């Protein structure tokens, strides 16, 4: 009878060991699936973050370029206005003299 109990006990231990192996295997599979899911989510978040940073950078760069262009145009306009004022002040006396001469001269 002890041999039957021993055989039954051994069989029960083997069955328990197989069940434990299945449980461990299922746990490993679940762990790997969770790790893969976490990795995929992390990669997605990194890509979204990278895209957002790239968009912010492009916005900043284009804004800086527009500001620089506007400042450059303002500076060029100021220089041209100054040049025109200087040119007009140099010739304005001659133009006034020419107009006065033209208006006061009578045709014969």
UniProtKB/Swiss-Prot annotation:
Region ranges (Disordered): 54-74
Single GO molecular function: proton-transporting ATPase activity, rotational mechanism
GO CC terms, sorted: vacuolar proton-transporting V-type ATPase complex; vacuole
Residues recorded with modification N-acetylmethionine: 1
Keywords recorded for this protein, A-Z: Acetylation, Coiled coil, Hydrogen ion transport, Ion transport, Membrane, Transport, Vacuole
Cross-referenced Pfam families: V-ATPase_G
Compartments it resides in: Vacuole membrane
Transmembrane segments: none
Bilayer topology: Peripheral membrane protein
InterPro entries xref list: V-ATPase_G (IPR005124)
Source organism, top-level taxon: Eukaryota
Sections of the chain in a coiled coil: 7-97
Family matches, as NCBIfam families: V_ATP_synt_G
Family: Belongs to the V-ATPase G subunit family.
Task of the protein: Catalytic subunit of the peripheral V1 complex of vacuolar ATPase (V-ATPase). V-ATPase is responsible for acidifying a variety of intracellular compartments in eukaryotic cells.
Subunit record text: V-ATPase is a heteromultimeric enzyme composed of a peripheral catalytic V1 complex (components A to H) attached to an integral membrane V0 proton pore complex (components: a, c, c'', d and e).
PANTHER family referenced in this protein's UniProt entry, alphabetically: V-TYPE PROTON ATPASE SUBUNIT G3, VACUOLAR ATP SYNTHASE SUBUNIT G
UniProt name for this protein: V-type proton ATPase subunit G3
